[in-house]
Amino acid sequence: MNSDSSSVSSRASSPDMDEMYLRDHHHRHHHHHQESRLNSVSSTQGDMVQKMPGESLSRAGAKAAGESSKYKIKKQLSEQDLQQLRLKINGRERKRMHDLNLAMDGLREVMPYAHGPSVRKLSKIATLLLARNYILMLTSSLEEMKRLVGEIYGGHHSAFHCGTVGHSAGHPAHAANAVHPVHPILGGALSSGNASSPLSATSLPTIGTIRPPHSLLKAPSTPPALQLGSGFQHWAGLPCPCTICQMPPPPHLSALSTANMARLSAESKDLLK
C-alpha cells in the first residue's frame, strides 16, 4: 500500500516537474535570445559608432586637402606675381645704371685729364668731384675776365680821349669854335716861317681842329703814366688809342713840320757855335 501510494504520488508529481522544467527552459531560451539580440544590437551600434568617426575623419581630411590645394594654388599665383615684380624691378634698376654709366662716360669725355689707354678709368665719385672743381675754376676765370673787361672798357673810356674838351661828335658847335693850343716847336716853326710860308696865323685853328693835339703836348709836366685802371696803363709818349686821334695828319702839315725841324736844328747848331 505504501509502495503504491508512493508511486502514485511520484506519478502525480511528475507532470509538475515537467512543467517546471519546460518553464525554466523556455525562460532560459528567451533570456538567451534577448541577450543575443542585445549583443547584435550593441555590435551594430558599435559598428555604426566606428563607422561615424571614420567618415568624419575622411570628410575632415577631404576638406583639409581641398583647403591645402587652394592654398597651394594661391601660393603658386603669389610666387608668380612676386617673380614678375622682381623681374620688373631688376629691369628698371638695370636701365637706371646703364643711363648713369652713359652719363658718366659723357662727362669723362669733356674732363681735362689724359684719355690714354694707360690711364685708369675714373670712378663716379672722382668724376663728379673733378667736374665740380672744373666748373668752379671756369666760373672764377669768367668772373675775373668780366671784371678786367669792365675796368678797361667800362667807365674808363673817357680817359682814352685827349684833353678835357670832348670830341666834335658830341658837341659840334663847341668843337667848331674851340681853338686848341699848338706845340711850342710847331708854333716857333710856323712863326719863323711866316715870311716864306704862304700859311697865315688864321689857318692854325683850322689845322688844330683837323687833328686834336695830344694832352701831353699841352702839359709838359704830365706824369709819366696815366692810370686808366688796374689792368691798363697809358704811358707817356704813346699815341692815343682812340680812333679819332689815330687820323693821319694832312700832307702839307707833315711836309712843313719836316722842313722847319731841319731848319731849327741848323739854327741851334749855329747858336751853339
Curated annotation (Swiss-Prot):
Compositional bias of kind Basic residues: 24-34
Function, in words: May determine the distinct specification program of class A neurons in the dorsal part of the spinal cord and suppress specification of class B neurons.
Keyword list, A-Z: Coiled coil, DNA-binding, Nucleus, Transcription, Transcription regulation
GO biological process, one term: negative regulation of transcription by RNA polymerase II
GO cellular component, one term: nucleus
Keyword Chloroplast: no
Domain of life: Eukaryota
Recorded coiled-coil stretches: 69-90
Bias-annotated ranges (Polar residues): 37-47
InterPro entries to which the protein is assigned, alphabetical: bHLH_dom, bHLH_transcription_factors, HLH_DNA-bd_sf, Olig3_bHLH
Keyword Transferase in record: no
Compartments where located: Nucleus
Gene3D superfamilies assigned: Helix-loop-helix DNA-binding domain
Tissue: Weakly expressed, mainly in non-neural tissues.
Low complexity: bias regions: 1-14
Residue ranges constituting the bHLH domain according to the UniProt record: 84-138
Pfam families with a match to the protein in the record: HLH
Principal place of residence: nucleus
Region (Disordered): 1-72
Protein name (record): Oligodendrocyte transcription factor 3
GO MF annotation terms: protein dimerization activity; sequence-specific double-stranded DNA binding
